[in-house]
């Protein structure tokens, strides 16, 4: 995306295709608050937008070759933390949607199993209150030591949710690994965070 107008247009298109604001925020790598603003206030500019940064990592994501190299670098960083803290890993948990391709390559590099977590923001239900869950098509996390992999930390809520979900199922989260951290944080819910890039606002 090159401008705020591009973001408004893309957010509006995705909304018209039936995506929820949480799903749109995942696609555009901005917070849900920013999506709400883009869809309701941006064109009128009556309310200032939230402070956020749009991240477009599609040049990496559209190439399995590039993504594999990024996953290798992230894997090395994960091993550094695990070694330093004398921790182990059984399962890499990818956060859907955009964290899954990266997580599958990290799991392959590490030689461990793969699980997929669907966060609440990916659920759309009018009948019941949505909540995140693990796909049953992948590894079981019960009693296992895990690393969570996602693409971007925007607010940290999705990863807090994932850690709590895994904890409720008897899993232990030892590391959270992301491509880009827009919060500049060292840990989430007491779990160390490693990122290839930290983006920190200075204003």
From Swiss-Prot:
The entry's keywords: DNA-binding, Transcription, Transcription regulation
CDD domains the UniProt entry points to: PRTases_typeI (cd06223)
Gene3D superfamilies for this protein: 3.40.50.2020
GO biological process: pyrimidine nucleobase biosynthetic process; regulation of gene expression; UMP biosynthetic process
UniProt entry tagged with the keyword Transcription regulation: yes
Molecular-function GO terms, alphabetical: DNA binding; orotate phosphoribosyltransferase activity
NCBIfam families the UniProt entry points to: PRK02277.1
PANTHER family: OROTATE PHOSPHORIBOSYLTRANSFERASE (PTHR19278), PYRE-LIKE PROTEIN (PTHR19278:SF41)
Record text about domains: Contains an N-terminal DNA-binding winged helix-turn-helix domain and a C-terminal regulatory domain (or effector binding domain) resembling phosphoribosyltransferase (PRT) domain.
Family, similarity comment: Belongs to the purine/pyrimidine phosphoribosyltransferase family. GfcR subfamily.
Name of protein: Transcriptional regulator GfcR
Annotated organism of origin: Methanothrix thermoacetophila (strain DSM 6194 / JCM 14653 / NBRC 101360 / PT) (Methanosaeta thermophila)
């Amino acid at each position: 995306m090159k401008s705020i107008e591009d973001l408004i247009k893309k957010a509006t298109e995705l909304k018209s295709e039936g995506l929820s604001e949480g799903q749109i925020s995942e696609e555009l790598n901005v917070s849900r608050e920013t999506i709400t603003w883009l869809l309701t206030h941006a064109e009128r500019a009556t309310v200032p937008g939230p402070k956020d940064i749009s991240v477009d990592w599609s040049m990496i994501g559209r190439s399995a070759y590039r993504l594999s190299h990024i996953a290798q670098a992230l894997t090395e960083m994960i091993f550094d933390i695990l070694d330093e803290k004398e921790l182990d890993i059984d399962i890499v948990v990818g956060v859907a949607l955009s964290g899954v391709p990266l997580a599958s390559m990290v799991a392959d590099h590490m030689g461990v199993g793969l699980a997929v977590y669907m966060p609440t923001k990916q659920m759309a239900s009018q009948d019941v209150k949505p909540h995140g869950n693990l796909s049953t098509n992948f590894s079981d996390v019960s009693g296992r030591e895990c690393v969570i992999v996602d693409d971007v930390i925007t607010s940290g809520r999705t990863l807090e949710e994932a850690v709590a979900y895994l904890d409720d199922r008897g899993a232990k989260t030892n590391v959270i690994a992301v491509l880009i951290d827009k919060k500049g944080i060292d840990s989430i819910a007491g779990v160390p965070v490693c990122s290839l890039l930290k983006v920190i606002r200075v204003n």
